């Protein structure tokens, strides 16, 4: 998620992609005068889009639908939250794996998907120990699995026997993915286990949403000073200020009424959630720049892939779990 909700990945790799052919237009704006609509003909209204070229109507409908489902789950059947996190882990992991493989990385898919489910579901009986055990086992299996994928990508050695090609870069990308999605998701699952767990999930989610909305609105209206132009040119310091104001305000309210914390603790939590949301967004923006893509997927109309919505939520979930564990 981003303050401007615009994640624009440039710097495409020089991989032989052909440039998009341009069409010479006349004054009417069409490529062929014969194809111009007849005068007085009824034209379809243009779809309303954001500055990122997304369908705003679809984005709002999808966002509200997901929000209503999550609210119902957390209020009436909070333990189903773990199943939702498990499904999100599966989908988001698959999205990133597909993008990495498109970029030439050889990623062990099966152990990542199974290990991710283990990391999430083992939190139910064992808590953080189960999450770390599932994560550790997943990493070990992935490292071994990649060794036996050497027939697909090999490099000659001086002795004549093939050796795994790009093993280090592939395993590094795999471990990064294992931390980024399955491990972070497992901390999100653990938020719901305490007695007031649903309140903590609401507090974290509302803080992230308020940060995004506030940053987007202020950035669009007043954004002039780029924050990190080499990673995300659309983000501005003005937008970040809007994120801070809205995120802190929302967290003070939710922390006070949902989890019973004092306003000053709510303010500190708000700062923490805004920072983790911003860092998560920047990390995904950098990953997409490295891969030369705009979105991780197309699952959610108007949003992109599921991972494009989880980028700020996942590190915020880790931060929320740490605070929940340490605070009395």
Swiss-Prot record:
Entry-linked Pfam families: CTP_transf_1
Catalysed reactions, semicolon-separated: a 1,2-diacyl-sn-glycero-3-phosphate + CTP + H(+) = a CDP-1,2-diacyl-sn-glycerol + diphosphate
UniProt subcellular location: Cell membrane
Endpoints of the signal sequence: none
A molecular function (GO) term: phosphatidate cytidylyltransferase activity
InterPro entries with a match to the protein in the record: PC_trans
Positions of the UniProt region annotated as Disordered: 15-50
Annotated TM spans: 58-78, 81-97, 103-123, 124-144, 173-193, 202-222, 239-259, 263-283
GO biological process, any: CDP-diacylglycerol biosynthetic process
Topology of this chain in the membrane: Multi-pass membrane protein
PROSITE patterns, per database record: CDS (PS01315)
Keyword Oxidoreductase: no
Predominant location category: membrane
GO CC, alphabetical: peptidoglycan-based cell wall; plasma membrane
Compositionally biased spans, kind Polar residues: 15-29
Record key words, sorted: Acetylation, Cell membrane, Lipid biosynthesis, Lipid metabolism, Membrane, Nucleotidyltransferase, Phospholipid biosynthesis, Phospholipid metabolism, Transferase, Transmembrane, Transmembrane helix
Pathway: Phospholipid metabolism; CDP-diacylglycerol biosynthesis; CDP-diacylglycerol from sn-glycerol 3-phosphate: step 3/3
UniProt EC number: 2.7.7.41
Full protein name: Phosphatidate cytidylyltransferase
Gene: cdsA
């Amino acid at each position: 998620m981003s303050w401007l909700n615009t994640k624009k990945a440039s710097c495409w790799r020089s991989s032989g992609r052909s440039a998009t052919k341009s069409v010479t237009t006349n004054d009417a704006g069409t490529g062929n005068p014969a194809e111009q609509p007849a005068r007085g003909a009824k034209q379809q209204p243009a779809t309303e889009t954001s500055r990122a070229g997304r369908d705003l109507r679809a984005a709002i409908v999808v966002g509200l639908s997901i929000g209503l489902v999550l609210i119902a789950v957390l209020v009436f059947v909070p333990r189903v939250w773990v199943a939702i996190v498990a499904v999100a882990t599966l989908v988001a992991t698959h999205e990133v794996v597909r993008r990495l493989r498109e970029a030439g990385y050889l990623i062990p898919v099966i152990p990542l998907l199974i290990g991710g489910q283990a990391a999430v579901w083992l939190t139910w009986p064992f808590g953080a120990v189960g999450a770390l055990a599932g994560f550790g086992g997943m990493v070990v299996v992935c490292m071994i699995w990649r060794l036996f994928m050497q027939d697909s990508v090999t490099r000659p050695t001086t002795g004549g026997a093939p050796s795994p090609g790009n093993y280090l870069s592939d395993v590094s990308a795999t471990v990064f993915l294992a931390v980024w999605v399955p491990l972070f998701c497992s901390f999100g699952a653990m938020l719901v286990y305490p007695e007031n767990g649903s309140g903590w999930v609401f507090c974290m989610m509302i803080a992230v949403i308020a940060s995004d909305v506030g940053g987007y609105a202020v950035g669009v209206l007043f954004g002039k000073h780029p924050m990190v132009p080499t990673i995300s040119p659309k983000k501005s310091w003005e937008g970040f200020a809007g994120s801070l104001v809205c995120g802190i305000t929302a967290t003070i309210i939710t922390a006070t009424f949902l989890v019973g914390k004092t306003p000053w603790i709510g303010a500190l939590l708000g700062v923490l959630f805004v920072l983790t949301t911003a860092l998560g967004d920047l990390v995904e923006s950098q990953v997409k720049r490295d891969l030369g893509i705009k979105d991780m997927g197309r699952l959610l109309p108007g949003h992109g892939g599921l991972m494009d919505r989880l980028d700020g939520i996942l590190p915020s979930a880790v931060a929320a779990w740490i605070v929940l564990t340490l605070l009395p």
